[in-house]
């Protein structure tokens, strides 16, 4: 599937009736959810409507890369609006490969797990070259403070809320303000079970708030996961009750 508009993105959800033969998606243009001024934009087609996080058992690959001659460009998703009682993010849950996604100014509120890319994982996943961040100009950060939450849920992570499966993260970062009811992590909110988690050449620069625990890269790990962090760093601010 080729993704060029917000409605194309929404149609990746199983609820749209997307053919089961479609297992891959390629984003080829910037996607803007607010103030587009376009007749076929999200605001015009669905005024006041929030984005429903994508759930699709068959979709296992998403890439945001466009080749321009010998160079490549990575289209951006701007101001993704999510407000859900379940898990929330660009994807409700995901398994497979996410590559080169650019998520700018995402506002995600979830009753369950919340993550910029995925609220939770439902299978082994690789995240490569992805970015979740805020823009000082587009997101009007001069009028906001570190108390303005952009990603919130029972568990919150800059990239992934809850990880219960093997996960590899490479060359990715998150820079936002997160609040977790129990856990909040710059990249991953919570890891559970006996899993292998490998994070390389990645970082988080976030404000993190939680009633339980926070972590610059990983909010909490319960179980006997094998975690490797290589050439990573974290910055920002953390506030937790535990």
Task: List PLM regions with ranges.
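Surface-exposed repetitive/solenoidal architectures
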Residues: 1-242
